[in-house]
């Protein structure tokens, strides 16, 4: 029997509540599909600041080092905003984890589920077609990290500058990640760039074309970022995998998230070259609803499914979770964020419904 060690970092706000439901669902699939998950919980974020005085204690990092994957909840809240920025939960925990594990690839699925069309802000005829896409975003290069970066001059001559830099090897590895994702899906990649203006995008487009030759089954399309943001609104059903640089992926993934209608539905994964990953909901810690039992656990549950698929290659078990989520939603069960006129189910009830549907 295959055994995997999972570092569980529930974090702050609704993190512990939704994490409990993800573990409940994982317990069900490991029993059904015959593999073993060993869960070890660690403090992170504000919870770690309160208990240990720092957002990412040494024992948490050590535990993550010893694990095969990290299942992450959410961090942050108004309680810790008075701290210096680099000591706050988000910057003091997530960014160091990404750096330590060299997590260069961010996967953000965006799916409009049947029965949830009314929550989609797009026109009804567009929403009726549904959509199921994943944004593959490069996380460690580009304008956020490129040098030189800074300010000089004074008065009206004050100047600020950032540099968009990409090495070919950075583009090669993120392109392969996107094509690998496409092979597990509908075999379409849309590479997003600005190759009519930017040198970095010209290299991006050239490199993606080279990598595409390794994946003859995958259909590739190049699209300028400005057009991509429009097509995402006009015809979201036409996208499968969107391959983006850091800044373009930052923008596109949030746009894709918004048109699903609920942040409580959106998982994400950040991976390194070895397939080690950190899996977390795309939404925040929502301290305003923490402890009330009304948070939507689906994003955390789907993040767990992504862990099974991308770090452990347990595709059948991952699909079973995703199908269970679809079935529960199709049966009309909703947490408060999605309840229309129906009586909403609690966080724990939603987790139990999904576990029972596997």
UniProtKB/Swiss-Prot annotation:
InterPro entries: IsoCit/isopropylmalate_DH_CS, IsoPropMal-DH-like_dom, Isopropylmalate_DH. Its EC number is 1.1.1.85. It catalyses: (2R,3S)-3-isopropylmalate + NAD(+) = 4-methyl-2-oxopentanoate + CO2 + NADH. Pathway: Amino-acid biosynthesis; L-leucine biosynthesis; L-leucine from 3-methyl-2-oxobutanoate: step 3/4. Its main location: cytoplasm. NAD(+) binds at residues 77-90, 284-296. The record marks 144, 194 as: Important for catalysis. One of its GO terms (biological process) is L-leucine biosynthetic process. Its cofactor is Mg(2+); Mn(2+). SUPFAM superfamilies: Isocitrate/Isopropylmalate dehydrogenase-like. Keywords: Amino-acid biosynthesis, Branched-chain amino acid biosynthesis, Cytoplasm, Leucine biosynthesis, Magnesium, Manganese, Metal-binding, NAD, Oxidoreductase. Mg(2+) binds at residues 226, 250, 254. Catalyzes the oxidation of 3-carboxy-2-hydroxy-4-methylpentanoate (3-isopropylmalate) to 3-carboxy-4-methyl-2-oxopentanoate. The product decarboxylates to 4-methyl-2 oxopentanoate. It is found in: Cytoplasm. This is 3-isopropylmalate dehydrogenase. GO terms for molecular function: 3-isopropylmalate dehydrogenase activity; magnesium ion binding; NAD binding. It comes from Mannheimia succiniciproducens (strain KCTC 0769BP / MBEL55E). Belongs to the isocitrate and isopropylmalate dehydrogenases family. LeuB type 1 subfamily.
């Amino acid at each position: 029997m295959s055994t995997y060690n999972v570092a569980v970092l529930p974090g702050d706000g609704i993190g512990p509540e939704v994490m409990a439901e993800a573990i409940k669902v994982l317990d069900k699939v490991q029993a059904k599909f015959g593999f073993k998950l060993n869960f070890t919980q660690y403090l992170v974020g504000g919870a770690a600041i309160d208990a240990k005085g720092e957002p990412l204690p040494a024992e948490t990092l050590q535990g993550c080092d010893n694990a095969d994957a990290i299942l992450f909840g959410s961090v942050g809240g108004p309680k810790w905003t008075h701290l210096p920025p680099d000591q706050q939960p988000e910057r003091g925990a997530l960014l160091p984890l990404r750096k330590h594990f060299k997590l260069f690839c961010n996967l953000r699925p965006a799916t409009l589920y049947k029965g949830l069309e009314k929550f989609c802000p797009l026109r009804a005829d567009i929403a009726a077609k549904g959509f199921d896409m994943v944004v593959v975003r490069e996380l460690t290069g580009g304008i956020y990290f490129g040098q030189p970066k800074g300010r000089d001059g004074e008065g009206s001559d004050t100047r600020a500058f950032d540099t968009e830099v990409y090495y070919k090897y950075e583009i090669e590895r993120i392109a392969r990640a996107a094509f690998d994702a496409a092979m597990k899906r509908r075999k379409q990649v849309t590479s997003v760039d600005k190759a009519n203006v930017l040198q970095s995008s010209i290299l991006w487009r050239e490199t993606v074309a080279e990598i595409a030759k390794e994946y003859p089954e995958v259909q590739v399309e190049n699209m300028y970022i400005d057009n991509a943001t429009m097509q995402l609104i006009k015809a979201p059903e036409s996208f499968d995998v969107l391959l983006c640089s850091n800044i373009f992926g930052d923008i596109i993934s949030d746009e894709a998230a918004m048109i699903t209608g609920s942040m409580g539905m959106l998982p994400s994964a950040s991976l390194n070259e070895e397939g080690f990953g950190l899996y977390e909901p795309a939404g925040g810690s929502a301290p305003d609803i923490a402890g009330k039992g009304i948070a939507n656990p689906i994003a955390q549950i789907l993040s767990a499914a992504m862990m099974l698929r991308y770090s452990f290659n347990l595709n059948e078990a991952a699909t079973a979770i995703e199908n269970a989520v679809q079935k529960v939603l199709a049966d009309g069960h909703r947490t408060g964020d999605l309840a229309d006129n129906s009586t909403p189910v609690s966080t724990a009830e939603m987790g139990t419904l999904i576990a029972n549907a596997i």
